[in-house]
Amino acid sequence: MVLPTCPMAEFALPRHSAVMERLRRRIELCRRHHSTCEARYEAVSPERLELERQHTFALHQRCIQAKAKRAGKHRQPPAAATAPVAAPAPASAPAAARLDAADGPEHGRPVAHLHDTVKRSLDSAASPQNGDQPNGYGDLFPGHKKTRREAPLGVSVSANGLPPASPLGQPDKPSGGDTLQTAGKHSLGLDPINKKCLADSGIHLNGGSNSSEPFPLSLSKELKQEPVDDLPCMIAGAGGSVAQSNLMPDLNLNEQEWKELIEELNRSVPDEDMKDLFTEDFEEKKDPEPPGSATQTPLAQDINIKTEFSPAAFEQEQLGSPQVRAGSAGQTFLGASSAPVGTDSPSLGSSQTLFHTTSQPGVDNSSPNLMPASAQAQSAQRALTSVVLPSQGPGGASELSSAHQLQQIAAKQKREQMLQNPQQAAPAPGPGQLATWQQAGPSHSPLDVPYPMEKPASPSGYKQDFTNSKLLMMPGVNKSSPRPGGPYLQPSHSNLLSHQSPSNLNQNPVNNQGSVLDYGNTKPLSHYKADCGQGGPGSGQNKPALMAYLPQQLPHLSNEQNSLFLMKPKSGNMPFRSLVPPGQEQNPSSVPVAAPAASVGTQPTVSVASTHNSSPYLSSQQQAAVMKQHQLLLDQQKQREQQQQQLQQQQFLQRQHLLAEQEKQQFQRHLTRPPPQYQDPTQSTFPQQVGQFTGPSAAVPGMNNLGPSNSSCPRVFPQPGTLMSMGPGHAPVSSLPSSSGQQDRGVAQFTGSQSLPQNSLYGMASGLAQIVAQPPPQATSTHAHIPRQTNVGQNASTSAAYGQNSLGSASLSQQHSKGTLPPGLTKPQVPRVSAAMGSQNASWQHQGMPNLSSQTSGNSSVNPFTAAPSFHIQQAHLKLAGQQFSQAMPSRPMAPLSSAGAAGPMLPPVSAQQRNSAPASAPPQAAPQQGLPGLSPSGPELGAFGQSPTSQMSGRPGLHCAQAYPVRTMGQELPFAYSGQPGSSGLSSVAGHTDLIDSLLKNRTSEEWINELDDLLGSQ
């Protein structure tokens, strides 16, 4: 294999290089073609210019004649007279006026100047309407010619910042029009740059600061619409050359080549960055643009309203784009993908804009130390208004009135907050806030934009910034973002409260700050460390931030998106989320959203949160009360966390021992398990497996601890490895649990949470609120302590957790009994074993349980084995996916249960239970599957981390995942089950096969192990 692989790699490299070479050649050809076209164009330019001059002169004469005629006919409405000529004529009229004025100064080249000015005026008038050529003027080549001239020049011009196009003698309208048009037309990935470069000019245009007010207003409207209209085209058109095609038909020949060139150029920039840039521009024009226009359009008013917004363009980039990025990133983070940003951006924009609003004060403060507090409050409320209003109606408020209403609202809110926040505004040290906010803002935007997942991390960064610059930051935060504080209030709610209270409650802030500092400092640890033991306590409160953050977004998100969000957070932030419930679940553990609401009543509803935050934070009494509540909560959290830490430490030690033993066993098994041997002595291998499983069962008793301990840590994967002696085949799984499970993913938490979350998910199937609340706590074994305190006892006896959770449904009760049945074996497995037994077996019972139940009566062990082999097959497949892992986990635990000697006697009741309750569990699980479908959707992605197993366990494992994978594996799994059904020997061989399957799946291509499976099945 290695030898062919190397040649393959060698061949692949030449292939890649050849492809790249071809691409380079093609790009070079495109460049040459472009250069040749440009050269020809330049060569023909004299003649073209002469013709254009003639035509321009003729047009000018015609315009003058028409003017004279109209003036003679109606002296009153010269403008109205020009109107009949359509847009070009009116445009040409002012152009002609300009030409007349220009003729005086430039008699030397009047024709050229006339040509340029008239052509530009016509094009500028026509292009905003996308080549409005009503009177045939555009049909003359001025439109095309001008666009042709701008085609190459326009590209170079846009690359050069667009000075050449605009300055050609057009004082206001054409320059701004052409520049923005070029920005719109030639947005070959340069559009963001152009817009940023043109931010000032755009501001002047939009602000109507041009000398000719009416024109810029009309142009600003047109241009505002045009770039927005073109942006999608540009984004979709891979550089906007498509948008150019209408205006520049001459470039149509080069369209594909230009696309390729632009794509090649754009490839240099990461797609995510490009998306961020486009979404920035696009979103700035959509959601933020009303606020953005508020920042841009009324520069004078903004200067009055916000002295800090004098750098409105810069701020709009930093703030608006962070907001947009926050929306996109947050949604990406939510798993809603950045696509819904446009729609969800109001809501997400509300929550995330709050985050960014918090950063906005930094930007705002950066410019105005003079108005730090009020300015921040202003900007915060302003952004919040734009945010809250969008949340109320997606962009409704922003769309209701362009910038002026926003200006008025901002001014009103500024006044209100000036009145409300005088206390906080005064305490906020402008420079301190500036420094802190600048730090927070910059660090925030870099983290926030590129890493939507990091966004929680960026809040943690904020929190660190807050904690570091806490005293300075937080007063500013309270003032600048009393509402934005809402999102932070949970992450930094104690921070914000503590900082807000510093002015009012210094004692509480100090205590909260200490705790907050711990949380803020630990949250990064928890965020970056998956270990629940360490990250748990710190991440607990930070994750309350996430919880608040999650619920905030989650309310906006659909259930699937919520589940997805949970899923994704679980992968990365799931520890946070689960931790979040603990921190916030202190009181409302079961209701994570309510919990965020409880801890930070305002966060769940961002707008409400912002309002509440503003009012309670504004009122020192409310702040004091909130601070007291938070202090109580923090004290409770500290106590709980201490208890949890102790439990986690114990569990962690147990986990380490168990993991070490399991890893040793797994590695030994893996080393001692060549697939061919199992093919030959499958039945003999089964006793070996029994020994192995008994070993795992021995490890499983440890895994009972692992159930909780691994549950907190890599339980999901370690269990696959340890529980699944088959796991040795899944050595990757075991390694995954050990490495990724414990460290990489919060899988430690997930594992813990999976055992529990699955339990809770099962229970959650019964209680979705528990799913939300408990799985996160479970996900965070440490913070799972809160739910775990219920679940931890349960998790300590995973069967107990299943018992309670499983009590929710008959299948859950089955799981509970199951979990209790092989507590030693199943505890690590229980979440999955009982889950797998309950839900998967239920599902398998659905699928295979009819057989299994019949088999179980005859062969109680057969059930486990049939389920196990099928599960093993699933596991093999499951190895492919996290869900598969989690299910593989349950399925493997199944094998250990069955293979474990105890599993046999215990499983007979289990099988009987499965048979008896499996039908019941099938409906309950069907219900959980239905109830969990949202979860299972969330689970599926979470499934990778084991909640999907839980949801899948309850819903999918049997039905969707078990079936989906079984669908693949059903043929194989059922064959195993059937082969197992005839006799336990077949099942034992199947158990051996499960190891075989694991090893095969691990070490072999699909064809190889399928062939081997066929051989095994044939032998049986």
UniProtKB/Swiss-Prot annotation:
Query: Where is the PTM Phosphoserine found along the chain?
Result: S45, S127, S310, S321, S367, S1019
Disulfide feature: none
Biased-composition ranges, Basic residues, are: 67-76
* Keywords, sorted A to Z: Acetylation, Activator, Notch signaling pathway, Nucleus, Phosphoprotein, Transcription, Transcription regulation
Quick one: where's region Disordered?
67-191, 335-522, 575-598, 663-686, 725-748, 794-866, 888-959
Report where it is expressed, by tissue.
At E9.5, strongly expressed in the telencephalon, first branchial arch, forelimb buds and somites. By 10.5 dpc, continuously expressed in brain and spinal cord. Also expressed in first and second branchial arches and limb buds. By 11.5 dpc, expression in CNS is weak but increases in mesodermal tissues. At 14.5 dpc, detected in epithelial cells in trachea, esophagus and proximal and distal tubules of the developing lungs.
Bias (Basic and acidic residues) occurs at 100-122
Please list the residue ranges that the record marks as compositionally biased, kind Low complexity: 77-99, 373-383, 419-435, 588-598, 911-920
In the record, which positions carry N6-acetyllysine? Answer: K827
Looking up InterPro entries in the UniProt record yields: MAML1-3, MAML1_3_TAD1, MAML1_3_TAD2, MAML_N_sf, Mastermind-like_N
Please list which residues make up the signal peptide: none
Which Pfam family, any one, appears in the UniProt record?
MamL-1
GO MF, any single term? peptide antigen binding
Q: Which GO terms describe its biological process?
A: atrioventricular node cell development; myoblast differentiation; Notch signaling pathway; positive regulation of muscle cell differentiation; positive regulation of myotube differentiation; positive regulation of transcription by RNA polymerase II; positive regulation of transcription of Notch receptor target
Where in this protein does the record put region Required for interaction with NOTCH proteins? 1-97
Q: Could you tell me where this protein is found in the cell?
A: Nucleus speckle
Q: What is known of its domains?
A: The C-terminal region is required for transcriptional activation.
> What family, per the record?
Belongs to the mastermind family.
Protein name (database record): Mastermind-like protein 1
> What is the organism field in this record?
Mus musculus (Mouse)
